[in-house]
Amino acid sequence: HTGHTKVRGNKEYWPNSGWVYYGNNREYKVAGQEPYDPNHIILPEIMKDNGYTTGMFGKWAGGYEGSVSTPDKRGIDRYYGYICQFQAHLYYPNFLNSYDRAAGDTEVKRVVMENNINYAMFGDDYKNRKDYSADLIHQEAMKWLDKQTGEQPFFGIFTYTLPHAELAQPNDSILQAYQGAFCQEKTYGGDAGSYYNHTNIAHQQFAAMVTRLDAYVGEVLEKLKEK
């Protein structure tokens, strides 16, 4: 950081927004961080003004929900991911955020994770959650790339969240490939306040998260070659 650009910081805008429930899980009605000043021009706005169709997939963290600085107001045509940087630490959330200008959306909305909300965010019940955000975000990014025909230039920002604070992912072949790969595993006891759940295979989880991200990147590059 050179000192010549805006730093978002992590000032939160949650405490006075009230509550909303998803299943038995309580969330703030408004989530997110301090918004960018609208006079501070950001890259997607420049690209949009120059004729590009724009997409962003992953973490936003450039302004809380409903603020002056959300993807729909800052040059993004298609967005899917986390508006809030804190929530982006977690991989089986109660909701994600979405905006699709082409579909007629007028603002960023919440998309409820129906396969998650009937289970607690912390504890053994958490293992029953099925909607894994990293996979969903990548899937939406690939759908967006598929729609690019070459008639209009496109600009994508892929702010994927792997790996991050929470060590959690599907128990699939990617995770299983690292079983027993480390001479000494590490146990993480969890943090109820942050909803980071316990794991006995911290090294295995982290390594698999990096591999999962690498697979995503490979798929993106292959799709770009097609285009």
Where are these regions (language model features)?
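N-terminal cofactor/phosphate-binding cores enriched in small/glycine residues
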Residues: H1-G3
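Conserved amphipathic alpha-helical interaction elements at protein-protein interfaces in regulatory
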Residues: K6, K147, K223-E226
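Formylglycine-dependent
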Residues: R8-Y52, W60-F154, T159-Q169, G193-A207
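Short alpha-helical functional segments enriched in proximate histidine and acidic residues
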Residues: N50, T54, W144, Y216-K223
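Metal-dependent active-site segment of extracytoplasmic phospho-/sulfohydrolases and closely related
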Residues: F154, T159-Y160, R212-K227
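Extended hydrophobic/aromatic segments used for targeting, binding, or gating
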Residues: S173-Y216
